[in-house]
Amino acid sequence: MSVITPELLARFDVPGPRYTSYPTADRFDEAFGEADYVQALQQRQSGTLGKQPPLSLYVHIPFCESLCYYCACNKIITQHKERAAEYLRYLRKEVELHTRHLGRGQAVSQLHLGGGTPTFMSDEELRQLMALLREHFKFVPGGEYSVEVDPRTVDEQRLAVLAELGFNRLSFGVQDFDPAVQKVVHRIQPADQVFALVEASRRLGFESVNVDLIYGLPLQTPESFDRTLAQVNRLRPDRIALYAYAHLPERFKPQRRIHVEDLPAGAAKVAMLSRSLDALTEAGYVYIGMDHFALPDDALAVAKRQGRLHRNFQGYSTQADCDLIALGVSSIGRIGSTYSQNAKTMEAYVDLLDQGHLPVVRGLALTRDDLIRRSVIMALMCQGHLQYEAINLAWLVDFKTLFAQELTQLEAMQAQGLVQLSESGIQVTAMGWFFVRGVAMVFDRYVQADRNRSRFSKII
Protein backbone atom coordinates (compact mmCIF):
# COMPACT_ATOMS: atom_id res chain seq x y z
CA MET A 1 0.00 0.00 0.00
CA SER A 2 1.03 3.65 -0.27
CA VAL A 3 3.14 5.06 2.53
CA ILE A 4 1.98 8.04 4.55
CA THR A 5 4.95 10.37 4.32
CA PRO A 6 6.16 12.76 7.03
CA GLU A 7 5.33 15.60 4.63
CA LEU A 8 1.69 14.49 4.39
CA LEU A 9 1.47 14.20 8.16
CA ALA A 10 3.01 17.61 8.74
CA ARG A 11 0.57 19.25 6.35
CA PHE A 12 -2.69 17.35 6.78
CA ASP A 13 -2.64 15.53 10.16
CA VAL A 14 -4.39 18.36 11.96
CA PRO A 15 -7.03 18.42 14.72
CA GLY A 16 -10.53 18.00 13.35
CA PRO A 17 -14.04 16.64 14.01
CA ARG A 18 -15.07 13.01 13.48
CA TYR A 19 -18.30 14.18 11.78
CA THR A 20 -20.80 11.93 13.49
CA SER A 21 -22.98 14.97 12.83
CA TYR A 22 -22.80 18.25 10.98
CA PRO A 23 -22.72 20.79 12.45
CA THR A 24 -20.74 19.07 15.19
CA ALA A 25 -21.91 18.91 18.82
CA ASP A 26 -19.55 21.67 19.94
CA ARG A 27 -21.75 24.05 17.90
CA PHE A 28 -24.89 23.26 19.88
CA ASP A 29 -26.38 26.23 21.70
CA GLU A 30 -28.34 26.62 24.93
CA ALA A 31 -30.71 28.93 23.06
CA PHE A 32 -32.19 25.68 21.69
CA GLY A 33 -34.16 24.04 24.48
CA GLU A 34 -37.10 21.86 25.39
CA ALA A 35 -39.69 23.95 23.51
CA ASP A 36 -37.72 23.68 20.26
CA TYR A 37 -37.31 19.93 20.73
CA VAL A 38 -41.01 19.45 21.45
CA GLN A 39 -41.84 21.41 18.29
CA ALA A 40 -39.62 19.06 16.26
CA LEU A 41 -41.32 16.01 17.81
CA GLN A 42 -44.76 17.42 17.07
CA GLN A 43 -43.81 18.20 13.47
CA ARG A 44 -42.65 14.62 13.05
CA GLN A 45 -45.90 13.30 14.53
CA SER A 46 -48.15 15.58 12.47
CA GLY A 47 -46.32 14.93 9.22
CA THR A 48 -45.97 18.65 8.48
CA LEU A 49 -42.39 18.02 7.30
CA GLY A 50 -43.45 15.29 4.88
CA LYS A 51 -43.09 11.52 5.11
CA GLN A 52 -41.82 10.31 8.48
CA PRO A 53 -38.27 8.95 8.26
CA PRO A 54 -37.47 5.70 10.11
CA LEU A 55 -36.94 6.00 13.85
CA SER A 56 -33.83 5.01 15.78
CA LEU A 57 -33.47 4.88 19.57
CA TYR A 58 -30.31 5.43 21.59
CA VAL A 59 -30.26 4.79 25.34
CA HIS A 60 -27.26 5.94 27.35
CA ILE A 61 -26.40 3.88 30.43
CA PRO A 62 -23.64 5.92 32.10
CA PHE A 63 -22.46 3.57 34.84
CA CYS A 64 -19.13 1.73 34.96
CA GLU A 65 -17.71 -0.35 37.80
CA SER A 66 -14.13 0.72 37.12
CA LEU A 67 -12.34 3.53 35.30
CA CYS A 68 -10.53 3.00 31.98
CA TYR A 69 -7.84 5.66 31.81
CA TYR A 70 -8.19 6.32 28.06
CA CYS A 71 -11.94 6.93 28.24
CA ALA A 72 -13.54 10.10 26.88
CA CYS A 73 -17.16 9.00 27.35
CA ASN A 74 -19.71 10.48 29.70
CA LYS A 75 -19.72 7.98 32.56
CA ILE A 76 -20.24 7.54 36.29
CA ILE A 77 -17.87 5.23 38.15
CA THR A 78 -19.71 3.42 40.93
CA GLN A 79 -19.94 0.08 42.70
CA HIS A 80 -23.48 0.85 43.85
CA LYS A 81 -25.68 -1.32 41.64
CA GLU A 82 -28.84 0.18 43.09
CA ARG A 83 -28.17 3.34 41.08
CA ALA A 84 -29.26 1.51 37.93
CA ALA A 85 -32.76 0.91 39.34
CA GLU A 86 -33.15 4.60 40.17
CA TYR A 87 -31.90 5.57 36.70
CA LEU A 88 -34.42 3.22 35.13
CA ARG A 89 -37.22 5.09 36.90
CA TYR A 90 -36.06 8.33 35.29
CA LEU A 91 -35.76 6.72 31.88
CA ARG A 92 -39.42 5.77 32.26
CA LYS A 93 -40.31 9.40 32.97
CA GLU A 94 -38.39 10.51 29.89
CA VAL A 95 -40.00 7.91 27.63
CA GLU A 96 -43.48 8.80 28.89
CA LEU A 97 -42.85 12.49 28.18
CA HIS A 98 -41.88 11.57 24.61
CA THR A 99 -45.09 9.58 24.22
CA ARG A 100 -47.13 12.71 25.03
CA HIS A 101 -45.82 14.29 21.84
CA LEU A 102 -45.38 11.26 19.58
CA GLY A 103 -48.11 8.91 20.76
CA ARG A 104 -47.48 5.21 21.29
CA GLY A 105 -46.43 2.73 18.66
CA GLN A 106 -43.90 4.69 16.60
CA ALA A 107 -42.05 2.13 14.46
CA VAL A 108 -38.40 1.65 15.45
CA SER A 109 -35.91 0.04 13.07
CA GLN A 110 -32.75 0.59 15.12
CA LEU A 111 -31.88 0.52 18.83
CA HIS A 112 -28.50 1.01 20.44
CA LEU A 113 -27.65 0.74 24.14
CA GLY A 114 -24.42 2.57 24.85
CA GLY A 115 -22.47 3.88 27.77
CA GLY A 116 -20.80 3.74 30.09
CA THR A 117 -21.52 0.04 30.43
CA PRO A 118 -25.08 -1.06 29.53
CA THR A 119 -24.37 -4.46 31.08
CA PHE A 120 -23.90 -2.68 34.42
CA MET A 121 -27.65 -3.25 34.66
CA SER A 122 -28.85 -6.57 36.02
CA ASP A 123 -30.71 -9.04 33.81
CA GLU A 124 -33.99 -8.02 35.44
CA GLU A 125 -33.27 -4.31 34.92
CA LEU A 126 -32.48 -4.93 31.25
CA ARG A 127 -35.77 -6.81 30.96
CA GLN A 128 -37.59 -3.86 32.53
CA LEU A 129 -35.87 -1.43 30.17
CA MET A 130 -36.83 -3.41 27.07
CA ALA A 131 -40.39 -3.86 28.37
CA LEU A 132 -40.58 -0.08 28.81
CA LEU A 133 -39.39 0.58 25.27
CA ARG A 134 -41.74 -2.02 23.78
CA GLU A 135 -44.63 -0.56 25.75
CA HIS A 136 -44.16 2.78 23.98
CA PHE A 137 -42.54 1.90 20.63
CA LYS A 138 -43.03 -0.80 17.99
CA PHE A 139 -39.85 -2.68 17.08
CA VAL A 140 -40.06 -3.78 13.46
CA PRO A 141 -38.87 -7.24 12.34
CA GLY A 142 -35.45 -7.20 10.71
CA GLY A 143 -34.25 -4.09 12.53
CA GLU A 144 -30.79 -3.56 14.01
CA TYR A 145 -30.86 -3.90 17.79
CA SER A 146 -27.41 -3.58 19.33
CA VAL A 147 -25.79 -3.27 22.72
CA GLU A 148 -22.27 -2.40 23.86
CA VAL A 149 -20.76 -5.13 26.04
CA ASP A 150 -17.86 -4.97 28.46
CA PRO A 151 -16.45 -8.54 28.33
CA ARG A 152 -15.59 -8.29 32.02
CA THR A 153 -19.26 -7.95 33.00
CA VAL A 154 -20.92 -10.82 31.11
CA ASP A 155 -20.89 -14.58 30.64
CA GLU A 156 -22.78 -16.85 28.24
CA GLN A 157 -25.87 -16.78 30.44
CA ARG A 158 -26.00 -12.98 30.29
CA LEU A 159 -25.54 -13.05 26.51
CA ALA A 160 -28.47 -15.47 26.32
CA VAL A 161 -30.60 -12.90 28.16
CA LEU A 162 -29.62 -10.22 25.62
CA ALA A 163 -30.62 -12.57 22.78
CA GLU A 164 -33.92 -13.34 24.55
CA LEU A 165 -34.61 -9.60 24.80
CA GLY A 166 -34.31 -9.19 21.03
CA PHE A 167 -30.80 -7.84 20.60
CA ASN A 168 -29.23 -9.16 17.41
CA ARG A 169 -25.92 -7.28 17.40
CA LEU A 170 -23.19 -7.07 20.02
CA SER A 171 -20.21 -4.74 20.30
CA PHE A 172 -17.36 -5.90 22.53
CA GLY A 173 -14.91 -3.34 23.88
CA VAL A 174 -11.52 -5.03 23.48
CA GLN A 175 -9.13 -2.12 22.70
CA ASP A 176 -5.94 -4.27 22.89
CA PHE A 177 -5.05 -7.85 23.83
CA ASP A 178 -1.57 -7.01 25.13
CA PRO A 179 -1.48 -7.54 28.95
CA ALA A 180 1.00 -4.69 29.51
CA VAL A 181 -1.20 -2.24 27.62
CA GLN A 182 -4.31 -3.47 29.44
CA LYS A 183 -2.61 -2.94 32.78
CA VAL A 184 -1.42 0.59 32.06
CA VAL A 185 -4.90 1.69 30.88
CA HIS A 186 -6.60 -0.09 33.81
CA ARG A 187 -8.66 -2.53 31.72
CA ILE A 188 -7.51 -6.11 32.19
CA GLN A 189 -9.48 -8.74 30.26
CA PRO A 190 -7.82 -12.01 29.14
CA ALA A 191 -8.05 -12.88 25.45
CA ASP A 192 -9.49 -16.30 26.30
CA GLN A 193 -12.46 -14.59 27.94
CA VAL A 194 -13.21 -12.56 24.80
CA PHE A 195 -12.82 -15.59 22.52
CA ALA A 196 -15.25 -17.59 24.67
CA LEU A 197 -17.83 -14.79 24.57
CA VAL A 198 -17.63 -14.35 20.80
CA GLU A 199 -18.03 -18.10 20.30
CA ALA A 200 -21.03 -18.05 22.64
CA SER A 201 -22.51 -15.13 20.68
CA ARG A 202 -22.42 -17.21 17.52
CA ARG A 203 -24.04 -20.20 19.21
CA LEU A 204 -26.79 -17.91 20.46
CA GLY A 205 -27.53 -16.66 16.95
CA PHE A 206 -26.46 -13.01 17.08
CA GLU A 207 -26.40 -11.68 13.52
CA SER A 208 -23.33 -9.49 13.93
CA VAL A 209 -20.47 -9.16 16.41
CA ASN A 210 -18.32 -6.02 16.49
CA VAL A 211 -14.97 -5.60 18.23
CA ASP A 212 -13.63 -2.17 19.20
CA LEU A 213 -9.86 -1.60 19.04
CA ILE A 214 -7.80 1.48 19.87
CA TYR A 215 -4.36 2.27 18.45
CA GLY A 216 -2.05 4.86 19.99
CA LEU A 217 -2.51 3.68 23.59
CA PRO A 218 0.41 3.82 26.05
CA LEU A 219 3.05 1.08 25.66
CA GLN A 220 1.70 0.01 22.28
CA THR A 221 4.20 -0.60 19.48
CA PRO A 222 3.57 -1.56 15.85
CA GLU A 223 4.81 -5.05 16.69
CA SER A 224 2.61 -5.48 19.77
CA PHE A 225 -0.42 -4.22 17.85
CA ASP A 226 0.36 -6.68 15.05
CA ARG A 227 -0.08 -9.44 17.62
CA THR A 228 -3.42 -8.00 18.73
CA LEU A 229 -4.57 -7.87 15.11
CA ALA A 230 -3.51 -11.48 14.56
CA GLN A 231 -5.72 -12.51 17.48
CA VAL A 232 -8.59 -10.39 16.18
CA ASN A 233 -8.30 -12.06 12.78
CA ARG A 234 -8.53 -15.43 14.54
CA LEU A 235 -11.60 -14.15 16.38
CA ARG A 236 -13.16 -13.16 13.04
CA PRO A 237 -15.77 -10.64 14.21
CA ASP A 238 -18.23 -9.40 11.60
CA ARG A 239 -17.20 -5.79 12.18
CA ILE A 240 -14.14 -4.06 13.57
CA ALA A 241 -13.98 -0.46 14.76
CA LEU A 242 -10.38 0.78 14.85
CA TYR A 243 -10.18 4.07 16.71
CA ALA A 244 -7.22 6.38 17.14
CA TYR A 245 -6.56 7.25 20.77
CA ALA A 246 -7.01 10.98 21.30
CA HIS A 247 -4.94 12.19 24.25
CA LEU A 248 -6.78 15.27 25.52
CA PRO A 249 -6.13 15.26 29.29
CA GLU A 250 -7.18 18.90 29.64
CA ARG A 251 -10.70 17.80 28.62
CA PHE A 252 -10.89 14.27 30.01
CA LYS A 253 -9.61 13.84 33.57
CA PRO A 254 -9.06 10.04 33.46
CA GLN A 255 -6.41 10.56 30.78
CA ARG A 256 -4.27 12.50 33.24
CA ARG A 257 -3.26 9.12 34.69
CA ILE A 258 -1.56 8.27 31.40
CA HIS A 259 2.08 9.31 31.15
CA VAL A 260 2.82 11.15 27.91
CA GLU A 261 6.21 9.44 27.64
CA ASP A 262 4.41 6.06 27.40
CA LEU A 263 2.46 7.09 24.30
CA PRO A 264 3.74 5.87 20.92
CA ALA A 265 5.37 8.52 18.74
CA GLY A 266 3.57 9.82 15.68
CA ALA A 267 5.48 7.60 13.26
CA ALA A 268 4.71 4.49 15.32
CA LYS A 269 1.03 5.42 15.46
CA VAL A 270 0.89 5.85 11.69
CA ALA A 271 2.64 2.50 11.27
CA MET A 272 -0.04 0.86 13.42
CA LEU A 273 -2.78 2.33 11.24
CA SER A 274 -1.22 1.40 7.91
CA ARG A 275 -0.26 -2.10 9.08
CA SER A 276 -3.76 -2.59 10.49
CA LEU A 277 -5.29 -1.68 7.15
CA ASP A 278 -2.99 -4.15 5.40
CA ALA A 279 -3.64 -6.95 7.89
CA LEU A 280 -7.41 -6.56 7.94
CA THR A 281 -7.89 -6.19 4.19
CA GLU A 282 -5.61 -9.17 3.57
CA ALA A 283 -7.80 -11.13 6.00
CA GLY A 284 -10.83 -10.35 3.83
CA TYR A 285 -12.32 -7.34 5.58
CA VAL A 286 -13.82 -4.48 3.58
CA TYR A 287 -12.54 -1.04 4.55
CA ILE A 288 -15.77 0.86 5.18
CA GLY A 289 -14.02 4.14 5.84
CA MET A 290 -12.08 6.06 8.45
CA ASP A 291 -12.32 3.66 11.40
CA HIS A 292 -14.63 0.81 10.37
CA PHE A 293 -14.09 -2.58 8.73
CA ALA A 294 -16.61 -5.33 7.96
CA LEU A 295 -16.75 -8.76 6.37
CA PRO A 296 -18.06 -8.62 2.78
CA ASP A 297 -21.45 -10.14 3.62
CA ASP A 298 -22.06 -7.93 6.67
CA ALA A 299 -24.87 -5.40 6.31
CA LEU A 300 -22.40 -2.51 6.67
CA ALA A 301 -20.30 -3.69 3.71
CA VAL A 302 -23.44 -4.33 1.66
CA ALA A 303 -24.72 -0.83 2.46
CA LYS A 304 -21.43 0.70 1.32
CA ARG A 305 -21.55 -1.20 -1.99
CA GLN A 306 -25.13 -0.06 -2.54
CA GLY A 307 -24.49 3.57 -1.58
CA ARG A 308 -26.75 3.38 1.49
CA LEU A 309 -24.13 4.08 4.15
CA HIS A 310 -24.81 6.79 6.71
CA ARG A 311 -22.97 8.26 9.67
CA ASN A 312 -24.53 9.04 13.03
CA PHE A 313 -23.47 9.51 16.64
CA GLN A 314 -22.50 5.83 16.91
CA GLY A 315 -20.33 5.91 13.75
CA TYR A 316 -21.13 4.31 10.40
CA SER A 317 -24.64 2.90 10.06
CA THR A 318 -26.89 1.18 7.54
CA GLN A 319 -29.86 3.23 8.74
CA ALA A 320 -29.76 6.25 6.46
CA ASP A 321 -31.49 9.46 7.49
CA CYS A 322 -33.21 8.12 10.61
CA ASP A 323 -34.73 10.38 13.16
CA LEU A 324 -32.92 9.55 16.40
CA ILE A 325 -34.55 9.78 19.83
CA ALA A 326 -31.81 9.84 22.45
CA LEU A 327 -32.67 8.82 26.00
CA GLY A 328 -30.61 9.20 29.14
CA VAL A 329 -28.08 11.60 30.57
CA SER A 330 -25.94 13.47 27.97
CA SER A 331 -27.56 11.68 24.99
CA ILE A 332 -27.63 13.42 21.61
CA GLY A 333 -30.57 13.03 19.24
CA ARG A 334 -31.68 14.19 15.82
CA ILE A 335 -35.26 14.96 14.82
CA GLY A 336 -35.92 16.46 11.40
CA SER A 337 -33.46 19.28 10.84
CA THR A 338 -32.61 19.65 14.54
CA TYR A 339 -30.06 18.22 16.95
CA SER A 340 -30.62 18.12 20.70
CA GLN A 341 -28.65 17.07 23.77
CA ASN A 342 -29.80 16.07 27.22
CA ALA A 343 -28.31 17.43 30.44
CA LYS A 344 -24.76 16.19 30.90
CA THR A 345 -24.88 15.68 34.67
CA MET A 346 -27.10 13.21 36.50
CA GLU A 347 -28.19 15.94 38.91
CA ALA A 348 -29.46 18.23 36.15
CA TYR A 349 -31.04 15.32 34.24
CA VAL A 350 -32.95 14.12 37.31
CA ASP A 351 -33.98 17.63 38.35
CA LEU A 352 -35.53 18.46 34.97
CA LEU A 353 -37.48 15.20 34.85
CA ASP A 354 -38.70 15.70 38.42
CA GLN A 355 -40.12 19.04 37.26
CA GLY A 356 -41.93 17.33 34.40
CA HIS A 357 -39.59 18.61 31.69
CA LEU A 358 -37.79 16.76 28.94
CA PRO A 359 -34.10 17.04 29.89
CA VAL A 360 -32.98 18.77 26.66
CA VAL A 361 -30.60 21.62 27.53
CA ARG A 362 -28.94 22.50 24.22
CA GLY A 363 -29.15 21.82 20.52
CA LEU A 364 -29.37 23.37 17.09
CA ALA A 365 -31.91 24.04 14.37
CA LEU A 366 -30.03 23.61 11.10
CA THR A 367 -30.08 26.33 8.46
CA ARG A 368 -30.41 25.59 4.75
CA ASP A 369 -26.65 26.13 4.42
CA ASP A 370 -26.05 23.61 7.24
CA LEU A 371 -28.23 21.03 5.48
CA ILE A 372 -26.48 21.46 2.13
CA ARG A 373 -23.04 21.19 3.72
CA ARG A 374 -24.15 18.17 5.76
CA SER A 375 -25.16 16.36 2.58
CA VAL A 376 -21.75 17.12 1.04
CA ILE A 377 -19.78 16.06 4.13
CA MET A 378 -21.76 12.85 4.61
CA ALA A 379 -21.32 11.89 0.94
CA LEU A 380 -17.55 12.28 1.30
CA MET A 381 -17.38 10.51 4.68
CA CYS A 382 -19.65 7.62 3.70
CA GLN A 383 -19.13 7.03 -0.01
CA GLY A 384 -15.81 8.74 -0.63
CA HIS A 385 -17.16 10.60 -3.62
CA LEU A 386 -19.89 12.96 -4.72
CA GLN A 387 -21.35 14.16 -7.99
CA TYR A 388 -21.94 17.89 -8.28
CA GLU A 389 -25.17 17.26 -10.18
CA ALA A 390 -26.63 15.25 -7.28
CA ILE A 391 -26.22 18.24 -4.96
CA ASN A 392 -27.47 20.62 -7.66
CA LEU A 393 -30.69 18.64 -8.14
CA ALA A 394 -31.29 17.97 -4.44
CA TRP A 395 -30.85 21.58 -3.35
CA LEU A 396 -31.42 23.62 -6.54
CA VAL A 397 -27.95 25.18 -6.36
CA ASP A 398 -24.88 25.35 -8.56
CA PHE A 399 -22.21 23.41 -6.67
CA LYS A 400 -19.22 24.93 -8.44
CA THR A 401 -20.44 28.45 -7.76
CA LEU A 402 -21.57 27.83 -4.19
CA PHE A 403 -18.36 26.02 -3.24
CA ALA A 404 -15.85 27.79 -5.47
CA GLN A 405 -13.59 28.65 -2.53
CA GLU A 406 -13.73 25.09 -1.17
CA LEU A 407 -12.85 23.58 -4.55
CA THR A 408 -9.82 25.87 -4.70
CA GLN A 409 -8.76 24.61 -1.25
CA LEU A 410 -9.09 21.01 -2.42
CA GLU A 411 -6.56 21.61 -5.18
CA ALA A 412 -3.77 21.38 -2.58
CA MET A 413 -5.10 17.97 -1.52
CA GLN A 414 -5.34 16.90 -5.15
CA ALA A 415 -1.70 17.85 -5.67
CA GLN A 416 -0.77 15.50 -2.81
CA GLY A 417 -2.88 12.63 -4.16
CA LEU A 418 -5.64 12.75 -1.53
CA VAL A 419 -8.55 13.63 -3.82
CA GLN A 420 -9.31 13.70 -7.53
CA LEU A 421 -11.29 16.65 -8.87
CA SER A 422 -13.12 16.34 -12.15
CA GLU A 423 -15.67 18.33 -14.11
CA SER A 424 -18.42 16.21 -12.55
CA GLY A 425 -17.35 15.59 -8.97
CA ILE A 426 -14.91 14.78 -6.16
CA GLN A 427 -13.33 11.38 -5.50
CA VAL A 428 -11.41 10.52 -2.32
CA THR A 429 -8.37 8.39 -3.18
CA ALA A 430 -7.13 5.32 -1.30
CA MET A 431 -4.56 7.53 0.46
CA GLY A 432 -7.18 10.22 0.96
CA TRP A 433 -9.30 7.92 3.13
CA PHE A 434 -6.69 8.32 5.87
CA PHE A 435 -7.34 12.08 5.74
CA VAL A 436 -11.06 12.05 4.89
CA ARG A 437 -11.85 14.09 8.01
CA GLY A 438 -9.57 16.79 6.60
CA VAL A 439 -11.34 16.62 3.23
CA ALA A 440 -14.68 17.07 4.99
CA MET A 441 -13.32 19.98 7.04
CA VAL A 442 -12.92 22.01 3.85
CA PHE A 443 -16.74 22.17 3.64
CA ASP A 444 -17.25 22.86 7.37
CA ARG A 445 -18.15 26.53 7.60
CA TYR A 446 -17.74 26.59 11.37
CA VAL A 447 -14.29 25.00 11.49
CA GLN A 448 -13.04 27.19 8.66
CA ALA A 449 -14.02 30.26 10.69
CA ASP A 450 -12.51 28.93 13.93
CA ARG A 451 -8.75 28.45 14.02
CA ASN A 452 -8.77 27.24 17.63
CA ARG A 453 -9.20 23.50 17.08
CA SER A 454 -7.38 22.15 20.14
CA ARG A 455 -10.64 20.60 21.40
CA PHE A 456 -10.44 18.07 18.55
CA SER A 457 -8.20 15.03 18.19
CA LYS A 458 -5.76 14.83 15.30
CA ILE A 459 -7.00 13.14 12.14
CA ILE A 460 -4.56 10.21 12.42
Where are these regions (language model features)?
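Short, amphipathic alpha-helical interaction segments positioned at domain boundaries
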Residues: M431-I460
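Flexible, acidic/Gly-rich N-terminal and inter-domain linker regions that tether
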Residues: M1-L55
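Minor-groove-contacting beta-hairpin "wing" of winged helix-turn-helix DNA-binding domains
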Residues: G425-T429
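Local cysteine-cluster metal-coordination motifs and their immediate loop/turn environment
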Residues: V59-K75
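A short, conserved structural fragment
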Residues: Q414-S424
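C-terminal scaffold of the Radical SAM
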Residues: S46-G47, P54, I77-H101, Q106-K400, ...
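Short amphipathic alpha-helical interaction segments
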Residues: D398-Q414
